[in-house]
Every structure is written in C-alpha cells, then in structure tokens.
C-alpha cells in the first residue's frame, strides 16, 4: 500500500497529475480502449449509484417520471433546431454504415436528448390536461472531446437529463428554478460543495435556451467547475417541433419546455475539492463505505464485539477488514479510499472495553472510547467531519475570490492567483469573446446573490448594472 501512496504526486507540485493519480490509484476508474472513454471500477460506480439514489428521491418529490429514450437520433430530426445543431456539431459522433451498407440517413449518437424527446412530446400532447410532462432519464451520452480527463471531460459520460413540457411560461420557468434548488441543496448538503447559483451569460447559455441557470464550484487549485445546469427554453423548442396544446380557452398554444442535468463530473468535483496527498477524502453521505472497522487480531471475542458494534451502527455503510493483511496496509487502504471514520479493535482494546476511533481528515487524532458509546460518538464525529469538509472548501473559495473593475486589474489578478473574479460586465457576446481572446477565461455565472450596481463594464466600458463571475475553468 505504501507503494500505492508513493504513486500519488503531491498536490502542490502538479495538481493535474495528482488528480489523475488519485483516480487511478484509488481504483475509481481506468482508461477505456478508445481515447476519451473510461471504465468505471466498482468503487467509482458505487459513488455514482449513491448520487443517483439521492437525486432520484428528490426528483420523485416533484413528480419526475424516469424514462429511457433511444441512443440514435436521425440527422433530419436533429437539424430542425438550428442553434442546437450548431452548438453541438463539432462534438457529434455519427453512424453512417451498418456492416458494409451505407445508411440512407446519418444517425447521431445522442449528445443530449432534447430533440428526440421533443419529437415524442409533439405526438403525445393534445390538451392542457395532458400537462405537465416531467421526464428524466439516467443514461450515457457522447460528445467527442479533444482534451479529456477522467470524470471531468470524457467523450462518453453518464448523466441524468430531465425534460419537461408545461402549459405556461411561468410554470416552466419556476420548475426550471425548482430543479436548480434541488441541485444546490444536493451539492451543499450531500457533496459538501459550497456552490454559487446564478444565470449564464448570453454567450455561455445552452444552445437554443432562453436562459440557463447553473451551480458553479471552485476547486482546490482555484479553477471553476460547472456542476449542474437547468435550462429554460420558453417556447423555442416547442415552436420548432410544433408542440401545441388546446388551452383552457379552447385555443391552440405552443407549450413551454425545460431541460436539466448533472453528470459524473460531480465525482471529479468531489476529488478536486476534498481529497489530499494520501488519497480520497469523501463526504460521509456519498462515501460507499462510511465506517471501516479494522480487526488487529481475529479472535472469537473480537468477532463478537465487532458484530455488536455493527448492530449499534446499522444506519451506516460499514466494512469490516479482518483479512490477514498487515495492520499498516489496512490503515493505508482505508485512508486512500477516503473512508470517513475508522475504528480499530485489538486484544488490548478488548481488555479495557475500548475501541480506537479516528476521522479521515484528522487521522493523527485517534481517540479511545468505551465501545458501548460508539453510536453516540460516531454520530457526532460524522457531523463534525462533514462540517469540517464543507468549511474547508468554503474557506478555499473565500480566499480565492477577488474583485476587479478594469481589464488591467483582472489580468493582474490572473497572473498572481487562480480563483473567482467578480467584475462589472455588460453581458454582450462580442465583449465576452474579446475577454476570452485576451485572457483564456470565460464567465461562470451572474450570481443570484448580488446587489444592483451602476458601473462601467470592466472590458468595454459600456454602462452596466451586472456583476459577473469570471474564472479559468475545467
């Protein structure tokens, strides 16, 4: 195990290599046979299953139905929405043959499912009584990426994509924001990511959307990561796909739609926010194993105590290591997996009716407790552990958040720091493209939580009342 730890490059020497080393050495994933693909190993997929479980429960509270739609989309169907096809065309993988036979029409491997779902909705809806339709699917999508990295940016990835149809503009927009609130709560309370909620600029919004809302997080190295988006289309898509319904006044009206999604890049966010040079550090609610019990020696008495402890801690996901591996190996294995709580028990502990317990983020602070008190101690320790992870991430964000009023100030900040930079910005697409050309950065969001200002755009000097976060991003 020490050899395994030696393979993790220190974070402060090469953050990118550290991240890759964490992914590979903690056995979350391996590289796939095709460039840009990856193999989910069991431990990594268990994290994704927990993400699915938590989100699916929240979706069902707002009447979301799970469905599954085809992977292949006819080119003619995709081409109906001009902005949409232009936004995705560089990334679309296309099937042109079956065996040696050329297909009559190209088939796109879905980069997202708006078009195929809209086509379905157009045949499904007649009256306002049929609405809303609120669908979600857990699936894979493909976007042919040039630069790839496990979890963060792969050509094929797993995600959930929700698609809804509503009878009114306000209902659709409100549902779009309701989903964003679910994402925010999930990110903060389950993943312990102190995300910022806001709206995307005109340049950064989703192709074909009226508005795109986002949750943005800052990684340990100061680069931003988009963790989830919710798109409000108004009637942009429904007009293209002629999705009409008979309203309460018996008049035909175009419906209103939304889409929203998060992906396996959330696992990348977990790694880059919480982990350290010794391996993963996982929030308790998303850790496949919440408590690791390590038996220093295997005796009948110790086995009985371990079973008793498991009964007391039955609310938690527990793994017992009673293998013949060395004690040091067992400790290192629990450490590299990021297991929140570690309990050690051996003959000497048993003599005193004690166990030794420690947290993944404070491994040197081992404490001995009466094993009869284990439930009370673990409950509090888990709360303290999660709070500590969240506060550490929040402190990193605060320390890496800056303000600039001119492009010169902004460039100077970028030379010295990585992080969020709050600037007055006009919001124009041309201006943002100019900023990207000058600095290789882009806007992350227009934060909801801001006071209206009267200022000059930090780049073009036009009047503005917006403050926008810019950053380098994954």
Curated annotation (Swiss-Prot):
MF annotations from Gene Ontology: ATP binding; proline-tRNA ligase activity
SMART domains for this protein: ProRS-C_1
Gene: proS
Function summary: Catalyzes the attachment of proline to tRNA(Pro) in a two-step reaction: proline is first activated by ATP to form Pro-AMP and then transferred to the acceptor end of tRNA(Pro).
Protein name: Proline--tRNA ligase
Record's subcellular location: Cytoplasm
Reactions listed under catalytic activity: tRNA(Pro) + L-proline + ATP = L-prolyl-tRNA(Pro) + AMP + diphosphate
UniProt family annotation: Belongs to the class-II aminoacyl-tRNA synthetase family. ProS type 3 subfamily.
GO CC list: aminoacyl-tRNA synthetase multienzyme complex; cytoplasm
Principal subcellular localisation of the protein: cytoplasm
Keywords: Aminoacyl-tRNA synthetase, ATP-binding, Cytoplasm, Ligase, Nucleotide-binding, Protein biosynthesis
GO term, biological process aspect, one: prolyl-tRNA aminoacylation
Domain notes: Consists of three domains: the N-terminal catalytic domain, the anticodon-binding domain and the C-terminal extension.
Subunit structure: Homodimer.
Superkingdom assignment: Bacteria
Enzyme Commission code(s) on record: 6.1.1.15
Residues forming coiled coils: none
A Pfam short name: tRNA-synt_2b
């Amino acid at each position: 195990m020490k050899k395994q730890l030696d393979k993790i490059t220190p974070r402060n020497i090469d953050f990118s290599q550290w991240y890759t080393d964490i992914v590979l050495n903690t056995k979350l994933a391996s590289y796939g046979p095709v460039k840009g693909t990856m193999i989910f190993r069991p431990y990594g997929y268990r994290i994704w299953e927990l993400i699915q479980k938590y989100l699916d429960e929240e979706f069902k509270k707002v009447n979301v139905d799970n469905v599954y739609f085809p992977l292949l989309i006819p080119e003619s169907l995709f081409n109906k929405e001009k902005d949409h096809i232009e936004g995705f065309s560089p990334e679309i993988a296309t099937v042109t043959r079956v065996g040696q036979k050329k297909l009559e029409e190209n088939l796109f491997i879905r980069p997202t499912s708006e078009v195929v779902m809209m086509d379905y909705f157009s045949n499904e809806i007649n009256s306002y009584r049929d609405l809303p339709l609120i669908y979600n699917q857990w699936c894979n999508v493909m976007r042919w990426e040039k630069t790839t990295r496990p979890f963060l940016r792969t050509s094929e990835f797993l995600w959930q994509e929700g698609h809804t149809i509503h009878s009114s503009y306000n209902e659709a927009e409100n549902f779009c924001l309701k989903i964003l609130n679910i994402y925010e709560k999930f990110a903060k309370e389950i993943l312990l990511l102190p995300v910022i909620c806001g709206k995307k600029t005109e340049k950064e919004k989703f192709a074909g959307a009226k508005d795109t809302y986002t949750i943005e997080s800052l990684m340990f190295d100061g680069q931003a990561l988009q963790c989830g988006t919710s798109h409000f289309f108004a009637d942009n898509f429904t007009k293209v796909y002629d999705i009409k319904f008979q309203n309460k006044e018996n008049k035909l009206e175009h419906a209103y739609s939304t889409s929203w999604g998060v992906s396996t890049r959330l696992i990348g966010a977990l790694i880059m926010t919480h982990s350290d040079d010794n391996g993963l550090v996982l929030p308790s609610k998303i850790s496949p194993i919440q408590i690791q019990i390590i038996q220093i020696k295997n005796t009948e008495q110790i086995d009985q105590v371990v079973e008793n402890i498991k009964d007391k801690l039955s609310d938690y996901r527990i793994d017992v290591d009673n293998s013949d591996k060395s004690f040091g190996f067992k400790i290192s294995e629990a450490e590299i997996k990021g297991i929140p709580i570690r309990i050690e028990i051996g003959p000497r502990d048993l003599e005193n009716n004690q166990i030794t317990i420690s947290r993944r983020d404070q491994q040197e602070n081992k404490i001995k407790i009466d094993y009869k008190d284990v439930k009370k101690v673990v409950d509090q320790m888990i709360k303290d552990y999660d709070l500590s992870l969240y506060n550490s991430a929040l402190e990193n964000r605060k320390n890496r958040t800056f303000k600039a009023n001119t492009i010169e100030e902004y460039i100077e900040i970028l030379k010295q720091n990585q992080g969020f930079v709050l600037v007055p910005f006009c919001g124009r697409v041309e201006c943002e493209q100019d900023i990207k050309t000058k600095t290789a950065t882009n806007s992350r969001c227009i934060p909801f939580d801001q006071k209206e200002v009267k200022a000059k755009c930090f780049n073009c000097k036009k009047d503005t009342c917006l403050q926008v976060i810019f950053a380098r991003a994954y």
